[in-house]
From Swiss-Prot:
Protein name (record): Rifampicin phosphotransferase
UniProt keywords, alphabetically: Antibiotic resistance, ATP-binding, Kinase, Nucleotide-binding, Transferase
Residue ranges of the region described as Rifampicin-binding: 326-754
Protein species of origin: Bacillus subtilis (strain 168)
Gene: rph
Keyword Ribonucleoprotein in annotation: no
Amino acid sequence: MSSLVLGLHEIEKTQLSLVGGKGLHLGELSKIQGIQVPEGFCVTTVGYQKAIEQNETLQVLLDQLTMLKVEDRDQIGNISRKIRQIIMEVDIPSDVVKAVAQYLSQFGEEHAYAVRSSATAEDLPHASFAGQQDTYLNITGVDAILQHISKCWASLFTDRAVIYRMQNGFDHSQVYLSVIVQRMVFPQASGILFTADPITSNRKVLSIDAGFGLGEALVSGLVSADCFKVQDGQIIDKRIATKKMAIYGRKEGGTETQQIDSDQQKAQTLTDEQILQLARIGRQIEAHFGQPQDIEWCLARDTFYIVQSRPITTLFPIPEASDQENHVYISVGHQQMMTDPIKPLGLSFFLLTTVAPMRKAGGRLFVDVTHHLASPDSREVFLKGMGQHDQLLKDALMTIIKRRDFIKSIPNDKTAPNPSRGNADMPAQVENDPTIVSDLIESSQTSIEELKQNIQTKSGSDLFRFILEDIQELKKILFNPKSSVLIRTAMNASLWINEKMNEWLGEKNAADTLSQSVPHNITSEMGLALLDVADVIRPYPEVIDYLQHVKDDNFLDELAKFDGGSKTRDAIYDYLSKYGMRCTGEIDITRTRWSEKPTTLVPMILNNIKNFEPNVGHRKFEQGRQEALKKEQELLDRLKQLPDGEQKAKETKRAIDIIRNFSGFREYPKYGMVNRYFVYKQALLKEAEQLIEAGVIHEKEDIYYLTFEELHEVVRTHKLDYQIISTRKDEYTLYEKLSPPRVITSDGEIVTGEYKRENLPAGAIVGLPVSSGVIEGRARVILNMEDADLEDGDILVTSFTDPSWTPLFVSIKGLVTEVGGLMTHGAVIAREYGLPAVVGVENAAKLIKDGQRIRVHGTEGYIEIF
């Protein structure tokens, strides 16, 4: 068997590097019993390499291309064009020509063929590369087919293919092209079959797009397609398009576009029987490959031919269930303000820390809420809580509940909270003593200091046992009933204030102002403390100039050579000693902390120096406190004028005191958790250094791709199959490209919610109002905190914020996020800083462009773009 040209039936599963993704799948398809694949052969990558390997000019151009970035579009275009020209002019090796001629003689030279590209970086489980290289239809004759083989080779360097490889991290010099030559099928109809619904991701629904003639009309967007949906062997939906034209093959070669007769334009492309037959074929192919497929098909002489099948790479994985029942899962990341994927060690630690059972999928965590939705009472309580947190999530759950047949109902749970109790109930009777919070904080800090001391003597298996024991201590602190009551009481007090002040005084969201500058909020204090760091640096221009150019994380050691450098270093070290364990995505223990990468803080410090006068941190806090006191007095005075006013004022005063005394504590348990996480991490990284010295791992960060239990075993035995690390790194790269759903079912269906809002201005973008007020300003769309370049008065637009973003809040005048709820980080800090904010705005960072002027309506929950 020649390695230059292979028949489709000769292709083996291990030959990706020879035949590319498309060739590999066609080889597999041709072996499935009952699946019709047009006969053909593959000119392998060996033939391509043999044709170009001696061309020195081409190698120079490839080296130049490798040095470019995606932004260098003009240079990419020029170099790619030169490469294509060289490849077109290269002689095809004589043994390749001979082998091609032999196969064509075997299949019939007189027939027409499709000549199709198949790259080694194409149709892979993690990157489809669909449509990046060229396909040519209805080619007749040996010479013409050889010419089009060269064209396919050259199409490896179209601008779009080059840019796509850059975006997906593939090396141009390591991607090769094979060419598939297949007997041409002249179909009456053709199209695409998805074995999972491409809109909802439901794995039980097949979706068929169908049109007359060749499939190129659909792929190129020339015509609209009929769309058929099939579930459990039944057609559940039909949408018949007006098909005005189709592409057909010409007898003399090539293709042509033809108008469809008007009486046929609305005709159903496939009969119902054919739709169901095609669906069965799709399920058979999916079962063979073991995952949902994107299948190209055509119908000729009442026979379905399959001309391609590739994995659907955009589906979010389904959380695993232990049974075959229907399940509903909600995203933990949307509640934690962290929708990025988490590495295995991070997932492992979070699962060890939490008390709620969770499922993993796509590098994220999900909670199975099926039981909560099954009984009427627990459902009402649960949905009420979700509505306060995330209205889009609640609406998605309501969509599932309305189907009635998806979740089996169970009797009411007698232990469930009484749903009849409303928000307007007076907050539970707790001792309204601010020292309770101080005592809880002091106890947590003492425990952390003890941990830091005790862990220093631990190593090897002792360290892992010690960490497991300390996590139990962490859980006691995190889920301390006293802490939970304080936080819940403060939340209820805010809800009570908002409801009663609206009812009694017609004033919306009064609790927002009352929540400004509360004591003991470790997160908002963190933002103000960085203003104090800026105050230390501000008098020293040499230090400021140095910081503007710093890139090395060892910069703190260099500061001493400048006037004011020692003071700057000490101020930053003091800041890091209290807040250095924080970072973006901090619930993932593997994320790089500020103490590990202090340059992260530099842009924020410089922004503070640029945007603010000295001592502004204290003034901001005091201003917020005075506004809260003023609002309190105003409300109490107005209430006393009402019937039964003294009693109303008394109840309101108590609720306000609860907000002022307790609401700041809400941010503290998480601060304690990430504090401990950083201590654990530093100890584990010392173990990683030992593993590097022993040759078990290549770099410290390799341990992030092991679970806690796996890492313990590796430390104990010094044995590891490194392929596990490599595979999980590839998986993580794939997960980074996926957007996690708020709600996903056990069928894989992604159920989305929507806001039910009326009477909004034309073009308004809707979200959840979480901090009242109206502000107009320049939108700064920032997806990475390190890229922040803010001016006083800007409005921050981003996907989500967690506590690490708080230092930016001192510079902005408003907030818009894609993810969030009433009590999530951004909302809480926005209220404390007095910033109008709207969260849960779908695709905000795409709909709003950086630099646009926008108006944020924090009271009503929408944004206007000007």
